[in-house]
Curated annotation (Swiss-Prot):
Residues 15-193 form the RNase H type-2 domain. It is an enzyme of class 3 (hydrolase). GO terms for biological process: DNA replication, removal of RNA primer; mismatch repair. SUPFAM superfamilies: Ribonuclease H-like. The gene is rnhB. The keyword Manganese applies. Its EC number is 3.1.26.4. This is Ribonuclease HII. InterPro entries: RNase_HII, RNase_HII/HIII, RNase_HII/HIII_dom, RNaseH-like_sf, RNaseH_sf. A divalent metal cation binds at D21, E22, D112. The keyword Plastid does not apply.
Length: 193
């Protein structure tokens, strides 16, 4: 059965609805990125779905379309702050900042996951990137934004292969850590090797 990705946007049709998702909760290196997107219900971009279900090429194409046609914002929390406040709090902070940075003030904020927020506008949705078009669009913007950041960092530290693994704990990444030690961009609070 096909899921109506606009179900929640339609449910809250009298409100300005933003979707939020993050990228980078699980990697061993780099920041966590959250993105907020307010879609235009009169201009639905075809092909938007959870970023994990898209090829890199398709994500890049949709990223350009989303950021050109919809209201959006992103927030980046560094690996240093992740180590200071923990990944959950860093993710929540990134989500809150992304929502606050939107040029339109959202009245309802649909967030992928099950994180509790003090702000009553925030509605957490488990598997939200498969249930809401706004969240799916945000997942694409967050993923592409973070992947581009990690690609930039990989030019400084090519031995960790971040251009391929985006900082995640792949076999090759862990082998590189064991051989070269941690880079300045590795999260110290994440135990991996």
């Amino acid at each position: 059965m096909e899921v109506d990705l606009l179900h929640f946007e339609k449910k809250y049709h009298n409100y300005i609805v933003a979707g939020i998702d993050e990228a980078g909760r699980g990697p061993l290196a780099g920041p966590v990125v959250a993105s907020a997107v307010i879609i235009d219900n009169t201009n639905i971009i075809p092909g938007i779905k959870d970023s994990k279900k898209l090829s890199k090429k398709k994500r890049e194409l949709l990223y350009e379309q989303i950021t050109s046609n919809y209201v959006w914002a992103a927030a980046i929390i560094s690996h240093i702050e992740i180590d200071e406040i923990n990944i959950l709090e860093a993710t929540k902070k990134a989500c809150s900042i992304a929502a606050a940075n939107l040029s339109l003030k959202p009245e309802i904020v649909l967030v992928d996951g099950n994180m509790p927020f003090k702000d009553k506008r925030f509605v957490s949705m488990i598997n939200g990137d498969n249930l809401s078009l706004s969240i799916a669009a945000a997942s694409i913007v967050a993923k592409v934004t973070r992947d581009r950041l990690m690609l930039d960092l990989s030019t400084e530290f090519p031995q960790y292969l971040w251009h391929k693994n985006s900082g995640y704990g792949t076999k090759e990444h862990i082998e590189a850590i064991n051989m070269h030690g941690l880079s300045p961009y590795h999260r110290r609070s994440f135990k991996c090797c």
